[in-house]
Every structure is written in C-alpha cells, then in structure tokens.
C-alpha cells in the first residue's frame, strides 16, 4: 500500500481535539472519526474493524506550541523575534501567536514552515509504520 503524502498533510492541517484520522492499512483509505466528550461512540468503520486501521498523529503528537518555538530563530527582524519570544513565554495560545504573526506580516512564512514540519512528521510516521508514500 502506498499513501499520498499530500493526504496526510491535509489531515494534519484539519487536526483538532475532536477529529481523529485513521489510515486503512489495506487500501490506504483515510477515515475520519469525530470524538466529542460525552457523546456516545457511534459504530463506524474504524470501531468495526480496529485492526485494519492505524491512527494518524493527533494534535498533541503534532505539538504546534513546540513547533512554533522552532520558527522563532527564522524570524529575521530581531525586534519582532524578541517580541514574539516574549509572547511565547507569556503562554499565549497558538491561535493568539498566529494572530501576532499575521500582524507582523509573517503568517504565510509560518504556514510554510508548519507545512514543511508536517511533511517531516508525515514521512517519519510512514517510515515508523512501514507505509510507502508518494510525494
């Protein structure tokens, strides 16, 4: 089975605490399961055949707060870099930090960096799980 790396990247970008993505190990089909706390878990293709699926990295696995810290050294303007570092240290959320990057005119650079990091994670995930992938 071969998976398209682009499909994994799309799943990573949509990732949130309530959406879990799974890959069918037999045919490469992607399944989406919504997990809302307090909701009864409905039967779905993943729960019906758990051995056929492998869970993609979750939002926690992707660790955007840590990833955004890795972006700071790439910021060219020392003043922006220092201000942004202070915002990180103040404990601002990723969405608040992204708004700051937008105000600084750097949000597209962040999204490009994030996508490159997602690509590395996707490749490693495929390799760790013995899944072939195409770029």
Each PLM stretch: what is its role?
Residues 1-48:
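Extended, charge-biased low-complexity segments
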Residues 1-3, 58, 88-89:
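Short, exposed beta-strand "edge-strand" segments with a Pro/Gly-rich flavor and a Y/T-containing core
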Residues 29-85:
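Aromatic-anchored, charged helix-turn/loop surface patch used as a conserved interaction hotspot
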Residues 63-117:
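Amphipathic protein-protein interaction modules
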Residues 110-135:
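Acidic, proline/glycine-rich low-complexity IDRs
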């Amino acid at each position: 089975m071969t998976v398209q790396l682009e499909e994994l990247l799309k799943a990573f970008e949509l990732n949130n605490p309530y959406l879990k993505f799974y890959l069918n190990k037999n045919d490469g089909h992607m399944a989406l399961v919504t997990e809302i706390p307090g909701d009864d878990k409905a039967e779905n293709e993943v729960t019906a055949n758990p051995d056929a699926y492998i869970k993609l990295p979750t939002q926690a696995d992707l660790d955007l707060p840590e990833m955004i810290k890795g972006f700071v050294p790439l910021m060219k303007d020392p003043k922006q870099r220092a201000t942004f570092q202070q915002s990180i240290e103040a404990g601002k959320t990723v969405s608040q930090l992204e708004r700051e990057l937008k105000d600084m005119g750097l949000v597209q650079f962040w999204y490009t960096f994030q996508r490159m990091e997602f690509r590395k994670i996707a490749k490693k995930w495929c390799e760790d799980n013995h899944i072939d992938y195409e770029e």
